[in-house]
Design a protein with these regions (language model features):
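Hydrophobic alpha-helical hairpins/lids featuring a short glycine-rich hinge
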Residues: 1-8
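FAD-binding core of flavoproteins
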Residues: 10, 15-126
Length: 126
């Protein structure tokens, strides 16, 4: 990283609504948490969402991992890897930074007093 002057962010938390896979399984819906969907000669193909990628909009790559313990049946979600921010199918959804335009601190508690650059990372398989 130092040699190539790479700035990396991390995405280590599934979206809160996706932390209960049973909800999606009962409705026959795909679980939105980032998962391995296939493997090929080039490596693994991933798809889904991860959160808390602070400053990812400024990063060269994002380190994917898991901060919250996973259940034994969540093998596909247990990937740890780094992905370049210019990867095909990668989208970064960020909170609005420095929300001084709100009328009060209650409407934007995190970004009222400081810059807030946490990002939701979505990766569509390609």
């Amino acid at each position: 990283m130092k040699k190539n002057d790479v700035f990396a962010s991390y995405a280590v938390v599934p979206p809160q609504a996706a932390r209960n896979p049973e909800f999606y399984q009962k409705r026959n819906l795909p679980i939105p948490t980032l998962s391995v969907v296939s493997e090929n000669d080039k490596g693994v193909v991933i798809s889904g969402m991860k959160m808390l990628a602070t400053s990812a909009i400024f990063a060269n790559e994002i380190w994917i991992g898991n901060l919250i313990p996973l259940a034994p049946d969540q093998v596909k979600q247990s990937i740890t890897c780094a992905i370049p921010c210019n990867s095909n199918g990668l989208s970064l959804w960020m909170r609005q930074p420095l929300s001084k335009h709100y009328d009060n601190q209650f409407d934007a508690p995190l970004s009222w007093n400081q810059d807030e650059t946490d990002v939701l990372v979505t990766k569509m398989k390609h």
